[in-house]
Amino acid sequence: MSTAEIAASSSRATAPGPRGLPFLGVAPHMKRDPLAFMRDTFARYGDIVALRLGPQRAMLVTSPEAAHQVLLDGGKTFGLSPLYEKLKPAIGGGLTVSEGAAWRRRRGIAQQAMSPRSVQALIATFVGCAEELAGEWRASKAPVDAAEAMFRLTVTAMFRSMFGQDLRPGPEVLDDFATMSRELGRRFFSTLPWLEHLPTSGNRAFAAAKARLDRLVYQLIAARSDEDDASDLLGRLLQAAKAEGRARLTSEEIHDEIFTFALAGHETTASTLTWFWLAMASEQDVARKVEAEVAAWHAAGPEWSLEGLGRLTYTRAVLDEVLRLFAPAWLLSR
């Protein structure tokens, strides 16, 4: 099916699909167990399914060909999904929710700030965070909650890579990121946007967490605005536009990009690492091969670089398989 045919099917709602409940459609079923709902729906109706989510209509596609056309070939046909509006209270006008000229400008600056050379410079930060956590595990010898540990690891690594190795996120910062991630996930599957404006406990917790993180980020931006230090992501964002002869990002724009990187990066990475540890615990043969490869690599003198880490081919293959089986971004919307 071509991009035009997918778009036409969407507008005519001719694809098969479940009817759902009056007014609510299939939203309650999808919210209860999204993955099970999608698996059962596609098994019954095929690769292209029409759904009604409250007042909204949606088309779900799973075939590789149709997904490729929607995500890559259909840029002019399929713009940003209305669902991305749900991210704006958290990330403002960041790269993820930008379009047109604003997106191109922000993307160019983000590419400059996240170039291979820039990522290479952050590896020492990532290694330091991992070594600290490994030291804690060796000292305690207690069972570990992998999901909690990987969340804490990724937020810590993200925080230091953005603002410098000397900064450590306290428990309140970790709690605030967890609160924002949880509430954004809940809102993403809500079909009643007005609920987000009610004074519920979840909405109040989200607003309080966002306000505290906003104050912290703006303070860090203000403290660094006149510096030329580009050793972390904040410094690179401050310098990237200047290096390309463009107007510098405003404090608000830098704030939005920091939240975009933070919220998009920490949860997906933590999820992947958590599933990786489950694979290591479940597949003993795989775990032994990973351990042997890493041990041999380390004994030869570990090369903490993109090229050096690339020599861990079996470990990379295991991570790729974890991503295939347990994709952290398992639903994309246009």
Regions found by a protein language model. Name each.
Residues 3-12, 246-262:
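Short, hydrophobic/aliphatic alpha-helical segments
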Residues 15-43, 54-57, 64-68, 82-163, ...:
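Cytochrome P450 catalytic-domain helical core, especially the substrate-recognition surface
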Residues 26-46, 219, 302-334:
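Conserved cytochrome P450 K-helix E-x-x-R motif and the immediately C-terminal K′/meander segment
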Residues 70, 130, 154, 217, ...:
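Structural preference for long, well-ordered alpha-helical segments in enzyme cores
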Residues 70-76:
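Short Gly/aromatic-enriched secondary-structure transition segments
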Residues 154, 268-293:
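Cytochrome P450 catalytic-core helices
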Residues 166-167, 182-190, 221-232, 285, ...:
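Proline-centered turn/helix-capping motifs that create local helix->coil transitions or kinks
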